[in-house]
A protein has these predicted regions:
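Hydrophobic faces of well-ordered beta-strands that scaffold small-molecule active sites
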Residues: 2-7, 28-30, 59-63, 83-85, ...
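Conserved, mostly hydrophobic/aromatic
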Residues: 15, 31, 75, 130, ...
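Glycine/Thr-rich beta-alpha phosphate-binding loop at enzyme active sites
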Residues: 34-42, 46, 113, 121-153, ...
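Glycine-rich phosphate-binding active-site loops on the catalytic face of alpha/beta enzymes
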Residues: 83-91, 131-142, 182-203
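C-terminal helical cap(s) of enzyme catalytic domains, especially alpha/beta-barrels
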Residues: 100, 180, 194-222
Length: 222
């Protein structure tokens, strides 16, 4: 199981400095929030492009926006590896998935806790990964919800093995074992990484804990 730091949880005062702190981490997760789908605003396309140009890591983008499809071309030009959009914001999911793949990126669907797993079943074969929120992405406490574990189990049982399952939201060290056992391939971690004095060291400790990170799926291996 791979541990992927979320740059949105780092200090935003000097992103270059924050990227330097995790320069040896091979994967970074970028949340793009537009202030409409969620009340919070994170990164614009210019900032994403600059981060992609500066970092040597493989970057995936999680679009928490009301119109995910409009970002695809700019993200592709920035060298992003993978993009997912929320089912709640996609009136035509196949159009989104097709455009992401046509742009040369891995395509994903994201689900909030309230969205049934069954909503993605008819799109199997059209997406490369599924991101399951494990907290409410409301910008408040973002506490891990234990009910998400059963959702991960159900998704893993229903979805082909080649589809990567992401778990994202409120996950700390105490939840890692449970999330791994439920069947997640990748875990997005924010405060658990960036709240440490040395984020890279914290990432490495969690990546190697009980073998996490060993024989894990990665986008370059799909």
């Amino acid at each position: 199981m791979k541990i992927i730091p979320s740059i949105a949880s780092a200090s935003q005062l000097d992103l270059k400095c924050q990227l330097d702190r995790i320069r040896d981490v091979p994967y970074i997760h970028i949340d793009v929030e537009d202030g409409n789908f969620l009340p919070n605003i994170t990164f614009g396309m210019k900032t994403v492009k600059e981060m992609a140009a500066y970092s040597k890591a493989e970057l995936d983008v999680h679009l928490l926006t009301t119109n995910p499809i409009k970002y695809i071309q700019e993200l592709s030009k920035s060298g992003i590896s993978a993009v997912c959009g929320h089912m709640e914001a996609l009136p035509y999911p196949l159009e989104f998935l097709h455009e992401v793949r046509q742009a040369g990126m891995k395509a994903g669907l994201a689900l909030n806790l309230s969205m049934p797993i069954e909503q993605v079943m008819s799109y199997i074969g059209s997406f490369d990964y599924l991101l399951l929120m494990t907290s409410e992405p409301d910008g408040c406490s973002q506490r891990f919800r234990s009910c998400a574990l059963e959702r991960i189990r159900r998704a893993r049982a229903c979805i082909p093995d080649e589809v990567i399952i992401y778990a994202d939201g409120g996950i700390g060290r105490d939840e890692l074992g449970k999330v791994a056992e439920a069947g997640a391939d990748c875990v997005v971690m924010g405060r658990a990484v960036w709240g440490a004095e040395d984020p890279a060291k914290a990432w490495k400790e969690m990546e190697t804990l009980n073998g996490y990170g060993t024989d894990s799926k990665a986008f370059r291996n799909i």
